[in-house]
Amino acid sequence: MRKYSFILILLLFSQLAVQAQDAKRIVSLVPWVTKSLYLMGEQSRLVGCTSFCPVEAADKIEVVANAMNINIEKVLLLKPDVVIASSLIKPETIDNLRKLGLKVVYQAYPKSFEEICAFFIQIGELVGQGANAKELVFQQKARLTKLKVGIPEGKNPNVFIQIGAKPLFCAVPETFMEDFIRFSGGKNIAAELKLGSVTREYVLKQDPDVIFIVTMGIVAQEEKDTWLSYQSLSASKSKKIFILDADKTCSPTPILFVDALEEMIRLMY
């Protein structure tokens, strides 16, 4: 399945290369696209972004969308060469943008570290930074290999990655979030699940050795305190319940993925 997803992402961006190889004006509706452009020093091409995109205030980039909805009128006024949208945007909204003559590239949520890398390279090629993007990916894969070599042998802790609180979601197979678990030498307690929604009772029954909470603000600490209150839980007994930076963990570039993985390995062992 991962092989087909990887092929699909390359096909999508081969179209992008033909349509927008000289893109001077980009509207990014995907936070990790915005991060990628900043990493490459190409943020000057950004004319529009979402309220969740990590931009510098001094760059005065127009906010044209929140997580779900786009202000189409604002997008049109910006006259972008290309709009990069994600699977969080309603399909009918994407269709409307295309009908209005805008070039829109649809980007599904990456399902693996490999897809994150492929996507980053294609964005680099879009803005004339293909070689630099490939070099950065090479460096991060080397970091990843080094991290994996340093993992203690014979230890394969059961891991629960909690994403959000109400409802309770977890990292499942065929997602890049599960790559965090695989690459760190852990075993995913949700390995048999296809959907990410779980109950607290399910997690308690699986009895994870390590819990990573990926959410923001006071909710994260409340969730940590809740898990710690279950004194028979292995992760609670060993105090291996940790809060991770949601921005770094949920919408990573190759660099941020490896940064997050490095932190997780340090905390696990």
Each model region followed by its residue ranges:
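Sec-dependent N-terminal signal peptides
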Residues: Y4-S14
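Sec/Tat signal peptide C-region and signal peptidase I cleavage site
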Residues: L16-A20
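Basic- and aromatic-lined ligand-binding clefts that recognize polyanionic substrates
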Residues: K24-L37, A131-S184
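Structured C-terminal subdomain patch of bacterial secreted/periplasmic proteins
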Residues: K24-R25, I70, E115-G128, K134, ...
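A short, structured surface patch at a secondary-structure boundary
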Residues: R25-I89, V105, I189-E192
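His/Asp/Glu-enriched short active-site or ligand-binding loop at hydrolase and phosphoryl-transfer sites
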Residues: T50, E174-G196, I243
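Flexible loop/hinge segments that line or gate small-molecule binding clefts
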Residues: P54, T93-Q122
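Short helices/loops that flank or line small-molecule/ion binding pockets
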Residues: I72-K79, K99-L100, T199-V210
